[in-house]
Amino acid sequence: MRLLQPRRVGGSECDWVAMIDVSSELARGCGSTAWNWANWAVHHWMLALWPRQCQDEVWGDDPSVLIASAILFPPGKAVRVDGGYRLSGRWPFSSGVDACAWDMMGAVVEGTGELRMFVVPREDYRVIDNWHVLGLRGTGSKDVECKDVFVAEHRTLAVDATKGGATHPGAASNPGPIFRIPLFAALPHMLIGIPLGIAQGAYEIFLEGLQARMSRYSGRSLADMTAVQMKVAEASASIDAARLVLRRSCIAAQEIAERNEAPDLMTKVTWRRDGAFAAQLCERAMDVIYKSAGATGLYDDQPLQRCYRDLHAANAHISMMWDAQATTYGRVALGLPCDNPTL
């Protein structure tokens, strides 16, 4: 969980590509476990961008404390008051929230339209038990709600301060390169390891099962069938291609940060495009595997059906939705204004 946390508080502060490598390995076994781990790990990295006072309040007693998030802006309303903001709203998809002592929430500041994020303690928000879903059931990604909660200024962070470089208020305390990586441009890297790992795990299950399976009609070994061999190749190529694309983006983000530079807009939308494209490659692999598994994959006691559900649930995340990310990339590539204000 402390993979990206600053070393000064006992974290590992690993290179950015570690998010892909570790989360995908966890997801080979369980997509929900990997999803929550990735969220909790990334929130320690994100907190390093906040003012030092906020970091000390959250990490002070327990640097391994768990932090959830619900960083969607339209559901939240923030009103500027003396010393901070009054925050209200109801946010969906706060993954792993039941185990957490804090939550990060997004809101639009009334009057200015500014996008801002807020760190809120457990006693100031309500968890709503409504995560009854098809896939990633184990994440407990429930709604959270605040009603006119005061949030001190130092527990808030403007989105404009997170667009790359040492422009955020935590830069002096956390000067490492990974804390100069732009938050929302790198969003795909935070979670895309999960569909990658799910697809890899499903591929391994599929491959192992083929060794002993015989056709119930012809009696032939499935492994001897040319069509099955081609499906194995297609699935593995899709997974390998996704991994290469994702690791390339992560390594590029790390290298730019190590040069103490911020990526330009075209680079940012390319990372978002590549993340969504990699997600589609993982989905392609999963669909090939599941269809090729036949009716065996329908049973509840077969892990392939959980892999199928979990991967499709993961790919419903906005950062992995191809149409949304491709549109943003296409606009910027064609010289039109970017439609994503967080970049």
Feature map (PLM): residue ranges:
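Glycine-rich flavin
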Residues: 1-100
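DPxDG-like acidic metal-binding loop motif
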Residues: 90-125, 129-130
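Glycine-rich beta->alpha junctions and the first turn(s) of the following alpha-helix
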Residues: 135, 143-239
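Generic structural signal for well-ordered, non-transmembrane alpha-helical segments
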Residues: 197, 233-240, 272, 276-283, ...
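Extended, amphipathic, non-transmembrane alpha-helical segments
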Residues: 208-210, 245-248, 284
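C-terminal helix-coil-helix/basic helical segment that borders enzyme active sites and/or dimer interfaces
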Residues: 240-277, 290-298
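Short segments within alpha-helical structural elements
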Residues: 284-291, 322-326
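Glycine-rich phosphate/cofactor-binding loops in nucleotide/flavin-utilizing enzymes
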Residues: 295-343
